[in-house]
Amino acid sequence: MHNKILVSSYILLVLLFSLSSFNIVVAKDGDESGNPFTPKGYVIRYWNKHVSNDLPKPWFLLNKASPLNAAQYATYTKLVADQNALSTHLQSFCSSANLMCAPDLLPSLEKHTGDIHFTTYGNKNFTNYGTNEPGIGVNTFKNYSEDASVNSFRRYGRGSPRDNKFDNYAPDGNVIDQSFNSYSTNTPGGSGQFTNYAPNTNVPDLRFTAYSDQGTGGEQEFKTYLEQGNSGGQSFKSYGKNGNGADSKFTSYGNETNVAASTFKNYGQNANGENQNFTSYSTNGNNPQNNFKNYGVGGNGPSETFTNYRDESNVGDDKFSNYVKDANAGEANFTNYGQSFNEGTDVFITYGKGGNDPHINFKTYGVNNTFKDYVKDTATFSNYHNKTSQDLASLSEVNGGKKVNNRWIEPGKFFREKMLKSGTIMPMPDIKDKMPKRSFLPRAIAAKLPFSTSKIDELKKIFHAANDSQVAKMIGDALSECERAPSPGETKQCVNSAEDMIDFATSVLGRNVVVRTTENTNGSKGNIMIGSIKGINGGKVTKSVSCHQTLYPSLLYYCHSVPKVRVYEADILDPNSKAKINHGVAICHVDTSSWGPRHGAFIALGSGPGKIEVCHWIFENDMTWATAD
């Protein structure tokens, strides 16, 4: 009996020792908690299996794996098999998986009397709020929607004469979605004021539908609206339509924005005696896009004024379709219009046609304008800048190999290879990642979700994305870019899991690979000094795979092969103290022959396609792959 107990104890000790050893091995191949059944644990094992070298693991990549724990991973893998089931658990899924999803806003039917002040609010739906509210007063929104994504104002202030003020609304937001539907409709008087609305935002989507429709008197003012915004768009549909004696003012609207789009549809249509003023609109912007359709059509005595419109911008396009058509009297004035540094395009189609004695004046306006079907007898054109081809070349092209008009290219964004020498002092651009923080989906979940433009309706249903929402636009844009045919000589793929990225990189470069990124953002937007520097693969011309983030609910990268490059690693020093502040990765494109002649690199550096190499830093959270040394 005693011997049996000893044998049993020995077996138990062996089993315990074996399990302990097993746990130690698993911890090496699992996530930081040592659990091999998490998505991150699987990605680490996948890296070990598919990458042939024993170099240190790229934790900046592996840490982008899904943060789901083992139980959550099992639950959502089961739910994704039934997309309706996943959709019903969307908010918990997005939160657990670190995705970017719009919140589901519940309608607000609350009533109030007196003046109401909203301070530091966000993610709220105002439906029927302030409807038919009597009396004179004001409702204010101050510091509203800071760092928030979605707000909806539906039938807000309908039939009420009260004033509404939005002060410092949605500042510094990322992928914000703000909608105003039937706002201040049928109002007798009252005013709306948007001051410092959505400044410094990244990819905003701002929508005003039937705003101030059938209003009487009152004034709607947008001051410092979307200033210094990046990309995104604004749409005004049926704004001020059927109004009576109302005024609208846009001052410093969209100034210093980057590739922002504005659409005005049925703006001021059939209005009586309305005044519309655009002052300093899209000034100093980079490639602003503005579209006015059915603007002021059928109005009675309208007054439309554009002053310093798209002044000093870089290219950009404006289109006016059916502008002030069938209007009775009234006037439209364009002063200092379209004086962009680099030539843009302005198209006027059916301008003032069918109107009764309209007065249309263009004073000091830019080149490359097209006027079709306008009232010649009542349109006045003065001081038209019809620049010669030589003048245009001095503005938008390279003249004599010198750098010209690089105000829209951030200092240090592009540079020559000779700058990558120890001791060089040079500017570094803003390399900070502007995208919202997200994680990869586990491959097992990503593979079961639709991912094509043909199934976009299914995706919108899963992610609760309304047809006109920013999330729906974001999904559509990403899928279209992913399905775009590759450029000549390019191999490309969109990857929404870490495993897919590993597969693509190794398919192009082989299994002996290294992935690199710039260590941090120190030195960004200032001068830096180059410290020690190393050329990857001996500094020889090589091939790499570059991966750049794309805006999507989950982390999504656009990866493509980049032939004929040289890749460098460099210590980045503070130019004053000489202390190391960063470790940067730079890539130099040796062959630029397929680049366009108006590429920002040539505007900043001079020369043209195929004549020079062009270098740039790898920005935060972007990465480049190369074969290991």
UniProtKB/Swiss-Prot annotation:
Residues spanning the signal sequence: 1-27
Biased composition (Polar residues): 267-293
PANTHER family: POLYGALACTURONASE 1 BETA-LIKE PROTEIN 2 (PTHR31458), POLYGALACTURONASE NON-CATALYTIC SUBUNIT AROGP2 (PTHR31458:SF15)
Positions annotated as propeptide: 28-109
Domain BURP: 414-628
Localization terms from the record: Secreted, Extracellular space, Apoplast; Secreted, Cell wall
GO CC annotations, alphabetized: apoplast
GO annotation, biological process: cell wall organization
Sugar attachment sites: N125, N143, N255, N277, N333, N368, N386
InterPro entries the UniProt entry points to: BURP_dom (IPR004873), PG-associated_BURP (IPR051897)
Originating gene: GP2
Cysteine-cysteine disulfides: none
Function description: Non-catalytic subunit of polygalacturonase.
Species name: Solanum lycopersicum (Tomato)
Subunit text: Interacts with polygalacturonase to form heterodimers.
Keywords of the record: Apoplast, Cell wall, Cell wall biogenesis/degradation, Glycoprotein, Secreted, Signal
TM annotation in the entry: none
Major localization listed first in the record, in broad terms: secreted
Superkingdom: Eukaryota
Name of the featured protein: Polygalacturonase non-catalytic subunit AroGP2
Region feature Disordered, mapped onto this chain: 267-305
